[in-house]
């Protein structure tokens, strides 16, 4: 069982990428559990045809410990992917990071991590790797980390910060598998992210081009893999899935000092002096 966490700054398309990646892996015959670790609870929506899933924390609040069972919090989605949303605290109360810790602990106790699973994916809110959101890394749950980024300053800044957290908790066994580019059609984007990944000691695992079919699929509450499996974009996600499946390059990243990061952005014309 490979346990993989997907990080990336808010709004980068992390949940969209994760759902299309897991859908592609499922069509390749893999058995998958996807745990959404974002208080917005939107990590599984397209796999469930738009169904707003009841979260682990909502169930805990309304039913108590006794009311939480796998039938309530685990829903089968596209490709028979087991879908879970950890949820978050009520707005303004409590810590969402603690919620992830509670949810994963509950899933373990309830026996969600069955031996027949090929993959467990964690879709994690990742602008800031605070203690709770770092939990899949820190506790050694996820051994493989992929970061979704684009050729924009804040996306790369967030990716570098995530690598700082990953390097700090490397003793738990977590390693960076690579950078996934979710393209924003920025000039020189592929070359920039290849250079950034190389400086980290890692790789650009795949460059996912921008295509409006992603939005059309989302409007229809489906992944691209489900909505139009013959499309070019579906083939891109299948290539990403194949690259992840065959990836053996797992490293402790070397985050860039801020001066070097800014110099690289200037070199590629993303930032002007």
From Swiss-Prot:
Its cofactor is [4Fe-4S] cluster. Homodimer. The keyword Iron-sulfur applies. The modification ADP-ribosylarginine is found at residue 98. Keywords: 4Fe-4S, ADP-ribosylation, ATP-binding, Iron, Iron-sulfur, Metal-binding, Nitrogen fixation, Nucleotide-binding, Oxidoreductase. One of its GO terms (biological process) is nitrogen fixation. The keyword Ligase does not apply. [4Fe-4S] cluster binds at residues 95, 130. The reversible ADP-ribosylation of Arg-98 inactivates the nitrogenase reductase and regulates nitrogenase activity. One of its GO terms (molecular function) is 4 iron, 4 sulfur cluster binding. This is Nitrogenase iron protein. It catalyses: N2 + 8 reduced [2Fe-2S]-[ferredoxin] + 16 ATP + 16 H2O = H2 + 8 oxidized [2Fe-2S]-[ferredoxin] + 2 NH4(+) + 16 ADP + 16 phosphate + 6 H(+). It is an enzyme of class 1 (oxidoreductase). Binds 1 [4Fe-4S] cluster per dimer. The key enzymatic reactions in nitrogen fixation are catalyzed by the nitrogenase complex, which has 2 components: the iron protein and the molybdenum-iron protein. Belongs to the NifH/BchL/ChlL family. Its EC number is 1.18.6.1. NCBIfam families: nifH. ATP binds at residues 8-15.
